Amino acid sequence: APPGFTPFRIY
């Protein structure tokens, strides 16, 4: 997974 990947969106 890429370094900025998250299982949910964080804004």
From Swiss-Prot:
Keywords: Amphibian defense peptide, G-protein coupled receptor impairing toxin, Secreted, Toxin, Vasoactive, Vasodilator. GO terms for cellular component: extracellular region. GO terms for molecular function: toxin activity. The record marks 11 as: Not sulfated. It comes from the Eukaryota. It is found in: Secreted. GO terms for biological process: defense response; vasodilation. Expressed by the skin glands. Belongs to the bradykinin-related peptide family. Produces in vitro relaxation of rat arterial smooth muscle and constriction of intestinal smooth muscle. May target bradykinin receptors (BDKRB). This is [Ala1,Thr6]-phyllokinin. It comes from Physalaemus signifer.
